């Protein structure tokens, strides 16, 4: 048995579904074969073949919460580009803004009229008074950690086991049998990341306090909810104690909301009254157009300005040529003003809550040892009987064969 399902039945189901998938998608199969001539493994980016299906699904178009592949199959899209299109594909306001800006140029490495409006909207929605724009949350997190180390003059950061903050090197540490290590799957890693990063379990306040007591932690970088390792919700007192402990030890708190923007208007931070020093969000922040934002308190911004003014000539390690480009700013303005609205959040919540309840009912009726976790409009089924408390429990809940069978079965069901 695996997750309450007999293994022989599971494997037979997956084999049948793979045959159904392949037979129904000749155009995707042909494009996959053609792409293998020039693209590594036939895809532009390795994540596109994370799921072991016969060949990748090639997409023709998407709108709202629907996706249509090149063979004409239409899907109810619950993935939404791994949340990059969290508020729906091709939101009309964003499409119009991008189309209009495209006529005026994509990038100038100079601000446009949209820049001050984007800044004002970010302040109004998310609360922090000073902002910077990047292309991805990986970039924004990397820059934020560099700022934190520069202004605290401390060398290390702290992450939670099972976290995800993009491909920021320092965050790729984990606990293995209770001891920290660099994640073994990293390619080309030449530095022991444990030297620069501490790692503790999510919800483990005692371990957090012990690491912070060392006095050399510049910044704790935290998702409000662990979301890339199943879904792990915080204990009721976790965030208040995290904030208290970081302040007590002179450590900055960076909240990465890239995966929890679904929580409600202003993200998890506004909904649950968190109080970070630095706040980062990417993916869906500009409707799926590459963009990320980094907000900071007035104190952090003042220290950042001073550090920039005092540093020797040369690259600061912060910024990229295309960061804050004209197209990104146009998409950000439209998405912040017209898509990330209280009314749209209310509509998403109104659909998500009954869906989560219905899925929970189906799981219970089938007597499966699974449960549903929800963060606002984001829902996940977790292959464990009860809510998870940390990254180690979340890793154990990844039942790979069952997940793979569910993935292809649901694809074939649309």
Positions of the model-derived regions?
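Conserved N-terminal phosphate-binding loop of PLP-dependent enzymes in the Aspartate aminotransferase
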Residues: 1-414
């Amino acid at each position: 048995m695996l997750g309450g399902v007999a293994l022989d039945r599971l494997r037979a189901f997956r084999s049948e579904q793979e045959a159904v998938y392949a037979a129904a998608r000749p155009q995707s199969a042909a494009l996959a074969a053609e792409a293998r001539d020039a693209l590594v493994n036939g895809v532009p980016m390795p994540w596109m073949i994370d799921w072991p299906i016969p060949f990748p699904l090639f997409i023709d178009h998407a709108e709202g919460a629907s996706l249509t592949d090149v063979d004409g199959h239409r899907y109810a899209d619950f993935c939404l580009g791994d949340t990059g299109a969290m508020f729906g594909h091709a939101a009309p306001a964003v499409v119009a803004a991008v189309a209009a800006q495209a006529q005026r140029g994509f990038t100038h490495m100079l601000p446009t009229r949209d820049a001050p409006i984007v800044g004002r909207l970010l302040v109004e929605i998310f609360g922090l008074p000073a902002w910077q724009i990047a292309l991805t949350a990986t970039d924004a997190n990397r820059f934020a950690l560099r700022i934190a180390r520069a202004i605290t003059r401390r060398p290390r950061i702290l992450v939670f086991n099972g976290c995800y903050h993009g491909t920021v090197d320092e965050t790729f540490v984990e606990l293995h049998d209770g001891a920290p290590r660099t994640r073994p799957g990293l390619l080309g890693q030449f530095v022991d990341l444990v030297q620069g990063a501490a790692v503790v379990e999510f919800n483990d306040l005692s371990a957090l306090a012990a690491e912070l007591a060392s006095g050399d932690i510049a910044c704790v970088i935290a998702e409000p909810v662990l979301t890339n390792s199943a879904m792990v919700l915080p204990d009721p007192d976790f965030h208040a104690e995290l904030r208290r402990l970081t302040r007590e030890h002179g450590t900055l708190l960076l909240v990465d909301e890239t995966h929890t923007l679904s929580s409600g208007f202003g993200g998890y931070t506004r909904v649950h009254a968190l109080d970070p020093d630095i706040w980062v969000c990417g993916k869906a922040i500009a409707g799926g157009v590459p963009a990320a934002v980094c907000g900071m308190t007035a104190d952090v911004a003042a220290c950042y300005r001073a550090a920039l003014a005092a540093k020797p000539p040369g690259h600061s390690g912060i910024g990229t040529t295309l960061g804050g480009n004209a197209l990104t700013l146009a998409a950000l303005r439209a998405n912040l003003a017209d898509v990330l609205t209280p009314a749209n959040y209310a509509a998403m919540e109104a659909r998500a809550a009954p869906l989560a309840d219905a899925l929970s009912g189906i799981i219970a009726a089938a007597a499966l040892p699974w449960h549903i976790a929800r963060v606002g409009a984001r829902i996940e089924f977790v292959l464990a009987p009860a809510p998870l408390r940390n990254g180690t429990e979340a890793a154990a809940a990844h039942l790979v064969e069952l997940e793979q069978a569910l993935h292809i079965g649901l694809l074939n069901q649309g």
